[in-house]
């Protein structure tokens, strides 16, 4: 009995160690696959971590004792080499990467709406009728039930709002993930799809430090500011999203760009806001108003002055707000501004 138990332990031990070099079954149909990123392997015989991959023999071998950990492997990587992103895109023969901004994550296909063949020639009437039927069934296959139909509508609405606001790709992906999380937890029931989509986009903007105000999102969406704010607080609580208060510094690059101010003004405004933050002048105040006042002060100091009306229009605040924040910053930071 003792001999059998020892033999079992010795046979199990190599399997547990070798398993690290094998692809997961859900990732590949064949287990004998060479992975580009592997966990650190340990030789089951000598305990060495010096493991090499022999591509000519298709084996994973211990460099110290020569033990073959795995053999008859298949390399799933490309046969070509690329030295920059442009070459990689040009030589790649696969489709677009998976994205959360499409209801089916971009894994389905779409039939082109133009009635032309691969050579650009018009197709016959019979083929045109056949293509019409194929397109109709393809649309039905892509959106099979009510939940997918609602998700497709919500993600298209989210993409529309993001396009109006000029938001980057990472913000859209983040917002789509948040919306999908809300759907999985059943947070959509009793609320409008547009409201949850706008709230998810607002949360994604704050998370990715590309801030947009509730007023800006409400202006391009079909939902008012109050509903977006209420829905945002609800999904933040239910999805356990903890976001720090918006930093006024995050607004400076966008405001400075819209006002066509040079980089020196932007740097000066950021410096003013950092000093104001150290003295607690930015807390319990609207970040857009503080950022607008800092930009106004910096533009005057750098000799590229913009009027309070111009800054207020870009920041979406009133001139009174800028004057109040301007007085606080100049008094507490001892900034001498000559108007």
UniProtKB/Swiss-Prot annotation:
Key words of the record: Metal-binding, Repeat, Transcription, Transcription regulation, Zinc, Zinc-finger
Zinc finger residue ranges, TFIIB-type: 39-70
Disulfide bonds: none
Any GO CC annotation of this UniProt entry: transcription preinitiation complex
An example Gene Ontology biological process: transcription preinitiation complex assembly
Recorded GO MF terms: DNA-binding transcription factor activity; TBP-class protein binding; zinc ion binding
Residue spans of the Sequence repeats: 156-239, 250-331
SMART domains membership: CYCLIN (SM00385)
Residues reported to bind Zn(2+): 43, 46, 62, 65
Function: Stabilizes TBP binding to an archaeal box-A promoter. Also responsible for recruiting RNA polymerase II to the pre-initiation complex (DNA-TBP-TFIIB).
Family per record: Belongs to the TFIIB family.
Name of the protein described by the UniProt record: Transcription initiation factor IIB
Protein encoded by which gene: tfb
């Amino acid at each position: 009995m003792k001999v059998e138990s020892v033999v079992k332990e010795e046979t199990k031990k190599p399997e547990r160690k070798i398993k690290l070099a094998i692809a997961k079954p859900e990732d590949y149909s064949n287990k004998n696959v060479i992975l580009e990123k592997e966990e650190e392997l340990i030789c089951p015989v000598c305990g060495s971590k010096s493991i090499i991959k022999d591509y000519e023999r298709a084996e994973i071998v211990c460099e110290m004792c020569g033990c073959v950990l795995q053999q008859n492997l298949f390399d799933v990587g490309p046969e070509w080499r690329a030295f920059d992103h442009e070459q990689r895109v040009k030589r790649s023969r696969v489709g677009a990467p998976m994205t959360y901004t499409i209801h089916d994550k971009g894994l389905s296909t779409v039939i082109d709406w133009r009635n032309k063949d691969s050579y650009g020639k018009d197709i016959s009437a019979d083929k045109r009728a056949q293509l019409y039927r194929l397109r109709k069934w393809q649309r039905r296959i892509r959106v099979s039930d009510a939940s997918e139909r609602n998700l497709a509508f919500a993600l298209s609405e989210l993409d529309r709002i993001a396009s109006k606001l000029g938001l980057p790709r990472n913000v859209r992906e983040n917002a789509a993930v948040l919306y999908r999380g809300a759907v999985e937890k059943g947070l959509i029931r009793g609320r409008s799809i547009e409201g949850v989509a706008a709230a998810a986009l607002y949360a994604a903007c704050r998370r990715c430090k590309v801030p947009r105000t509730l007023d800006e999102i409400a202006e391009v969406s079909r939902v008012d500011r109050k509903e977006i704010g209420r829905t945002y607080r609800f999904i933040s609580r239910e999805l356990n999203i903890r976001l720090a208060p918006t930093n006024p510094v995050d607004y400076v690059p966008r405001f400075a760009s819209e006002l066509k101010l040079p980089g020196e003004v932007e740097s000066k405004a950021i410096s003013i806001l950092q000093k104001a933050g150290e003295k607690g002048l930015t807390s319990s105040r609207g970040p857009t108003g503080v950022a607008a006042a800092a930009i106004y002060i910096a533009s005057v100091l750098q000799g590229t002055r913009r009027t309070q009306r111009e800054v207020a229009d870009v920041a979406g605040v009133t001139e009174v707000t800028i004057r109040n924040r301007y007085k606080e910053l100049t008094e507490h930071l001892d900034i001498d501004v000559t108007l």
